[in-house]
């Protein structure tokens, strides 16, 4: 069974991947079963996302808004409670072998008077639990990048130089990250 699972994982894009030999068959089944459920959920999502190239593993209670603005590569894992608000000028492009773990929020637009630019996530990227990516200016995440839990990225800051004006009246500065 381990040989088959190793082969499947390698076909999904994880070269030279080998399951730990100390895992029992029962433990392996307990790990694989939820992945099968996620793949079924992902299959339904891929019907609604027209720009999808491969298997999507979709967690529970995941919210993806503006699906027409998203393109997904091969073997993408989107964990439980992930929120992706993809409304932006250039959309959200997620590469191959990308994992976005639970409770992560990707927010591409805050107000509709000025849409966010867009987000590109490269290949072989891992985004840990509880991350926040605010896309106002263009955000580009390269290949082979790993974000630990709780990483936050902001591509916009409020101007605050005039002490006689409220901060929300002074505008914003956007800069790509």
Model region roles, listed by residue range:
Residues 1-55, 144, 150-151, 155-171:
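Terminal amphipathic alpha-helical/low-complexity segments used for targeting or macromolecular assembly
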Residues 51, 57-66:
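Long amphipathic N-terminal alpha/beta scaffold segment
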Residues 56-57, 79:
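Short Pro/Gly-enriched beta-strand edge/turn motifs at strand-loop
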Residues 63, 67-71, 77-177:
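Flexible, glycine/small-residue-enriched loop-and-beta-strand segment within the central core
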């Amino acid at each position: 069974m381990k040989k088959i699972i190793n082969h499947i994982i390698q076909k999904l894009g994880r070269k030279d991947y080998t399951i730990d030999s100390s895992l029992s068959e029962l433990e392996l089944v307990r790990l694989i079963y939820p992945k099968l459920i996620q793949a079924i959920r992902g299959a339904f999502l891929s019907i609604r996302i027209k720009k999808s190239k491969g298997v999507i593993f979709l967690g529970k209670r995941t919210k993806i808004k503006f699906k027409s603005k998203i393109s997904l590569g091969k073997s993408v894992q989107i964990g439980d409670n992930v929120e992706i608000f993809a409304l932006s000028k250039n959309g959200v492009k997620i590469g191959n072998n990308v994992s976005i773990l639970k409770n992560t929020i990707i927010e591409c637009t805050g107000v509709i008077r000025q849409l966010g630019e867009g987000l590109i996530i490269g290949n072989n990227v891992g985004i840990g639990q509880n991350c926040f990516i605010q896309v106002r200016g263009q955000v580009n995440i390269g290949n082979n990048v790993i974000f630990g839990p709780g990483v936050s990225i902001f591509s916009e800051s409020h101007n605050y130089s005039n002490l006689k004006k409220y901060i929300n009246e002074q505008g914003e500065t956007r800069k790509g990250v």
